Swiss-Prot record:
InterPro entries: CDK, Kinase-like_dom_sf, Prot_kinase_dom, Protein_kinase_ATP_BS, Ser/Thr_kinase_AS. Residues 359-372, 457-467, 491-534, 543-559 have a biased composition (Basic and acidic residues). The gene is stk-1. GO terms for biological process: intracellular phosphate ion homeostasis; positive regulation of transcription elongation by RNA polymerase II; transcription elongation by RNA polymerase II. Residues 359-559 are annotated as: Disordered. CDD domains: STKc_BUR1. This is Serine/threonine-protein kinase bur1. ATP binds at L46, G47, E48, G49, T50, F51, G52, E53, V54, K69. One of its GO terms (molecular function) is protein serine kinase activity. It comes from Neurospora crassa (strain ATCC 24698 / 74-OR23-1A / CBS 708.71 / DSM 1257 / FGSC 987). The keyword Nucleus applies. Belongs to the protein kinase superfamily. CMGC Ser/Thr protein kinase family. CDC2/CDKX subfamily. Serine/threonine-protein kinase involved in transcription regulation. Phosphorylates the mus-8/ubc2 ubiquitin-conjugating enzyme (E2), leading to monoubiquitination of histone H2B and the silencing of telomeric-associated genes. Also required for histone H3 methylation. Necessary for the recovery from pheromone-induced growth arrest in the cell cycle G1 phase. It is an enzyme of class 2 (transferase). It catalyses: L-seryl-[protein] + ATP = O-phospho-L-seryl-[protein] + ADP + H(+); L-threonyl-[protein] + ATP = O-phospho-L-threonyl-[protein] + ADP + H(+); [DNA-directed RNA polymerase] + ATP = phospho-[DNA-directed RNA polymerase] + ADP + H(+).
Length: 559
């Protein structure tokens, strides 16, 4: 039974939140609850990043290998990260062979001598030997067509389950697909996932229409569909299916196929692949916020020519996954029934797939060291390959999310493929898992209906939240919930947490007084983070200086 069916109670009255949660509990034995970190023997570090650290560990009770994901709170005043809360909530509800399973939570209490007051929280999941991005980066790995079909089938089965239960993943990419040496693929990283309202996909009906608005600041740029690049907010499961198309093409080519350096460049690459939009191929695209300033020259797509060597059945499935019209884009149910999976060679069984050496962050560095040991290439590049330009050096690889890394894509995959631009897509997106040294994304363009004379306030309706109201509240005095997505994803870089909004507003106020240089270097410490016992009083009437009672008395006497 799906979440929607349980919520509606089979046509009866709406269920309360508690009844809804109780109806979707997994078997009591499947989620242990909380244990101590001492119950695990830590074996090694798999990766680290903004969200936390991931370690390989062994349970002292069962002997099973697990992955421990340490959840880092960059600013304890902000509380537990909302991305972690949402991920834990969803993973506790979900149970499918192709969805990463949350076994339990583990707690590490700081010693009494430690100044930290809050315990450290770990998510405990089954250990997976690889992620798909890491396998593609391993020069010793070569995917066969039955292997590609096997992985794609499992991905579609997992998405079919998620969408049938009203879950949008919203970050579909190769780095978030974990694979073990038994050939099992599991969807991971639910930090951006959420429950969605509307109809679930039906056979032969595409992805349908959205029912409410959500933030468009989701999905890593190289896997982001054109409707999100044009700031559609009422989107559907079609955004995940576009990501499936990107992953499918990546397995075929051995590298990401749409490597945009900005949102505008990403759209141009989409138009190159699928053709420029029209009312026939993408109805209503002109009404999207990003479609009103569209000025690209009309051109046909090159998808069929680009993937010609893979055959007409592959091209047929890719065209369905890369449809510009999100309403008619193929859903997971129909994709599973596509002739591609019934055409020889047939998909391999997971147990028949070969095993590979581990492909995590530190293993990628090993792959890079192997390449570094090669003799210098001639000026034009290694024979059979072009020169490598704009190299970013070793990639850090781990995003801090469920994927243990996704990193360091070199696009060579055993030397079979031509080179491509190395390095992450700069600009406006979430921190991708294959690169941690990223900055905050630039703000998306202002909405077309903005006619103000001053700078736009980027903290309210700009991110799918209702505009701020005065003391009178919303018009009409209604207090009901607004039909918007209240979740704003985190875009933290791998380093200190960004300044809070109150700092930004204070700086803006100081700027208006003309007395503050916005680019001045801030102190290396943060007064707010100091221990309360050493925090200075906030009502000091004068600058800190040596007190001299006699001098002060003489000064007042002269007045």
């Amino acid at each position: 039974m799906s979440i929607d069916e349980a919520k509606e109670g089979g046509g009866g009255p709406a269920m309360s939140p508690r009844a809804f949660a109780l109806a979707h509990q997994r078997d009591r034995g499947s989620f242990v609850g909380c244990s101590r970190i001492a119950d695990y023997e830590v074996l090694g570090k798999l990766g680290e990043g903004t969200f936390g650290e991931v370690h390989r560990a062994r349970s002292r009770k069962t002997g099973a290998l697990v992955a421990l994901k340490k959840i880092i709170m960059h600013n304890e005043r902000d509380g537990f990260p909302i991305t972690a809360l949402r991920e834990i909530k969803l993973l506790k509800l979900l149970s499918h062979k192709n969805v990463l399973r949350l076994e339990e939570m583990a707690i590490e209490h700081p010693p009494r001598t430690d100044k930290r007051t809050r315990p450290i929280v770990y998510m405990v999941t089954p250990y997976m030997d690889h992620d798909l991005s890491g396998l593609l980066d391993n020069p010793s790995v070569r995917f066969t067509e039955p292997q590609v079909k096997c992985y794609l089938l499992q991905l579609l089965e997992g998405l079919k389950y998620l969408h049938a239960n009203h879950i949008l993943h919203r970050d579909m990419k190769a780095a978030n697909l974990l694979i073990n040496n038994k050939g099992v693929l599991q969807i991971a990283d639910f930090g951006l996932a959420r429950h969605y309202e509307g109809d679930i996909p039906q056979p032969g009906k595409g992805s349908g229409e959205g029912k409410r608005d959500y933030t468009s600041l989701v999905v890593t740029r190289w896997y982001r569909p054109p409707e999100l690049l044009m700031h559609l907010k009422r989107y559907t499961t079609a955004i995940d299916m576009w990501g499936v198309g990107c992953v499918f093409a990546e397995m075929l080519e051995g590298k990401p196929v749409l490597q945009g350096e900005s949102d505008l460049h990403q759209l141009e690459l989409v138009w190159d692949l699928c053709g420029t939009p029209s009312e026939e191929t993408m109805p209503g695209w002109r009404t999207l916020p990003g479609g009103q300033a569209f000025s690209s020259k009309p051109r046909p797509g090159n998808l069929a020519r680009r993937f010609e060597k893979h055959g007409p059945v592959v091209i047929s499935l890719l065209k369905e996954l890369f449809k510009l019209d999100w309403r008619s884009r193929i859903n997971a149910i129909d994709a599973l029934n596509h002739p591609y999976f019934r055409t020889a060679p047939l998909p391999a069984l997971p147990g028949d797939l070969p095993t590979f050496e581990e492909s995590h962050e530190f293993d990628r560095r090993k792959f890079q060291d192997r390449k570094a040991a090669l003799p210098p290439a001639p000026k034009g590049g290694t024979v059979g390959r072009g020169a490598v330009v704009n190299s970013q050096g070793p990639d850090t690889g781990f995003s801090g999310r469920d994927g243990y890394g996704g990193g360091g894509r070199n696009g060579a995959n055993g030397g079979r493929y031509p080179p491509y631009h190395r390095g992450p897509p700069p600009g406006d997106e979430r921190v991708p898992s294959w690169h941690s040294a990223r900055g905050l994304p630039p703000r998306p363009p202002m909405p077309a209906d903005y006619h103000g004379s001053g700078p736009m306030d980027h903290t309210d309706g700009y991110r799918d939240r209702p505009p701020r109201r005065g003391p009178g509240g919303p018009p009409g005095g209604g207090g009901g919930p607004s039909n918007v997505d209240t979740y704003i994803p985190s875009y933290d870089r791998d380093g200190p947490a960004p300044r809070r909004e109150d700092w930004r507003r204070r700086d803006d106020w100081d700027d208006r007084r003309g007395g503050v240089d916005r680019d001045r270097r801030r102190p290396e410490y943060d007064v707010r983070s100091r221990d309360s016992r050493t925090r200075s009083r906030t009502r000091s009437r004068s600058p800190v200086r040596d007190r001299d009672r006699g001098r002060d008395r003489d000064a007042y006497a002269r007045r």
